[in-house]
């Protein structure tokens, strides 16, 4: 890649970031709360599944 292509790539990247920042908006309290609850629930489910798998493999002796 030539240096001109790299510079143009960074300029486009910066323009894309600026566009995202101008379009983005702060979520309201209810939407944030729902996202937080769903994220924590999924994290807990994955953690419990990992614990169960680890326990089963330990009991089997693998």
From Swiss-Prot:
The chain crosses the membrane at residues 40-60. It is found in: Cell membrane. Gene3D superfamilies: Preprotein translocase SecE subunit (1.20.5.820). GO terms for biological process: intracellular protein transmembrane transport; protein secretion; protein targeting. It is a single-pass membrane protein. Belongs to the SecE/SEC61-gamma family. Component of the Sec protein translocase complex. Heterotrimer consisting of SecY (alpha), SecG (beta) and SecE (gamma) subunits. The heterotrimers can form oligomers, although 1 heterotrimer is thought to be able to translocate proteins. Interacts with the ribosome. May interact with SecDF, and other proteins may be involved. This is Protein translocase subunit SecE. The lineage of its organism: Archaea, Thermoproteota, Thermoprotei, Sulfolobales, Sulfolobaceae.
